[in-house]
A protein has these predicted regions:
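Donor nucleotide-sugar binding/catalytic pocket of nucleotide-sugar-dependent glycosyltransferases
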Residues: 136-179
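Conserved catalytic-core segment of nucleotide-activated headgroup transferases in glycan assembly
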Residues: 19-29, 173-176, 189-231, 238-248
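Membrane-proximal helix-turn-helix segments that form the acceptor-binding/catalytic region
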Residues: 25, 74-79, 98, 111, ...
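N-terminal subdomain of nucleotide-sugar transferases
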Residues: 1-46, 208-213, 217
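Nucleotide-sugar-dependent
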Residues: 14-20, 197-201, 245-249, 259-281, ...
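A charged, aromatic-enriched C-terminal amphipathic alpha-helix characteristic of glycosyltransferases
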Residues: 307-318, 324-359
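Short His-centered aromatic/hydrophobic patch
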Residues: 91-96, 113
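Active-site proximal beta-strand in glycosyltransferases
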Residues: 3, 104-121
Length: 362
């Protein structure tokens, strides 16, 4: 197959992190299967994909000019995609920009979804909520298929089940993992990697937990002092945005990595979080507060599960503390959890779905 992989206005710092790594792995594995793949990215600034097609637009201006610039960039990108003559287009869902709807005239489009976009944009602002509600069907409506990272999202995003859907949870390339040695901390160190403005990460919960147990260090990566409200205790370290090597350095000193702690705020209960998978492949025990699509039935001592509720962290604070102490000096047995996360198996499933979609269009 000749595949056009399309992303629209993903922030460069996101493309330098786990999302970019995920996209790079997709492209690498698809090419290993003999498919021709090119990434086409509409972006406000350069992203670390020098070998791919980037279409920059100036976002540092007033609203009208910015949207005009974005539309101009979108037209240039769609022209390039059309000239590429793909058999199929894999579009990572993003907020609609004119004239994105024309992408469906080029080739069958499979939409890659990653969250409940309706609730996500509701939390950003009334403007973005209604902009997304009024335009999202321009992307989903004509789509030839949808890929979802969870079964829960299928019911939310394709409620009528009127088009082909494939559930492919996020995974990892097991040929490219590195188990970090367990640190020799005097007291436990917990780490959460997130992005400011996303309340479902539950950073506020960890801060309250830190106040209860001042001997435990809490690393919060991605958040700076201006990104949190209220007092922050001395045992909470706000690292701000870090590049991938800097994140790895923080994780190297971590006893327990925290997954998203407040998915309920986004009306979600199931996920396959990239940061949880990254931590596991570094060998770091994890705290999970949601139903993991791959790991929900896996019972190992290095995974602690708590309910997906507003009071989950404080209600289970003692259990979390005990788990953190118990995990000091321990690492995850990747031979047990790895087979559930194998990206190569997942990409075989995704590519087979592409073939199914194309067969249905003939």
């Amino acid at each position: 197959m000749r595949i056009a992989y399309v992303t629209i206005h993903i922030a460069p710092e996101i493309m330098r992190g786990g999302v970019g790594k995920k996209i790079r792995t997709h492209i690498k594995l698809w090419r290993e299967h003999g498919h021709a793949v090119t990434l086409f990215s509409l972006t406000p600034a350069e992203i670390p994909f020098p070998e791919e097609r980037q279409f920059l637009f100036d976002a540092k201006t007033n609203l009208l000019k910015r949207e005009s610039n974005r539309a101009s960039g979108m037209k240039r990108m769609l022209k390039a995609v059309r000239e590429y003559q793909p058999d199929i287009i894999y579009l990572r869902f993003g907020l609609y920009s004119y004239p994105l709807h024309e992408i469906h005239k080029i080739a069958p489009v499979v939409v890659d979804t990653n969250s409940n976009d309706v609730d996500e944009y509701r939390k950003k602002s009334v403007f973005f909520y209604w902009l997304n509600r009024l335009t999202r069907n321009l992307t989903f409506g004509p789509a030839a298929g949808v890929v979802s990272p969870s079964y829960e999202l299928v019911d939310i995003l394709v409620p009528r089940h009127d088009k082909p859907v494939c559930v492919v949870a996020n995974g990892v390339d097991l040929t490219d993992v590195e188990i970090l040695p367990a640190p020799k901390n005097t007291y436990p160190v917990l780490t959460l990697v997130g992005t400011p403005g996303m309340s479902w990460h539950g950073v506020d919960k960890l801060i309250e937990f830190a106040k209860r147990y001042p001997e435990i260090t809490i690393n919060i990566v991605g958040y700076g002092p201006g990104d949190v409200d209220g007092d922050v205790p001395a045992n909470v370290k706000l690292h701000g945005f870090l590049n991938s090597q800097q994140v790895k350095d923080v994780l190297a000193g971590t006893d327990v990595a925290c997954g998203t702690l407040a998915f309920h705020r986004n009306k979600m209960h199931e996920a396959s979080a990239l940061k949880v998978r990254e931590a596991l492949t570094f060998g770091i025990p994890v705290l999970i507060a949601f139903r993991d699509t791959d790991l929900n039935d896996v019972q190992v001592e290095t995974i602690l599960r708590i309910p997906n509720t507003e009071d989950n962290v404080l209600r289970h604070a003692e259990e979390i503390r005990d788990f953190a102490y118990a995990m000091m000096g321990k690492r995850v047995d990747l031979s047990v959890v790895g087979p559930y996360l194998d990206q190569r198996k997942k990409e075989q499933k995704r590519l087979a779905f592409f073939e199914q979609v194309l067969a249905g269009k003939k």
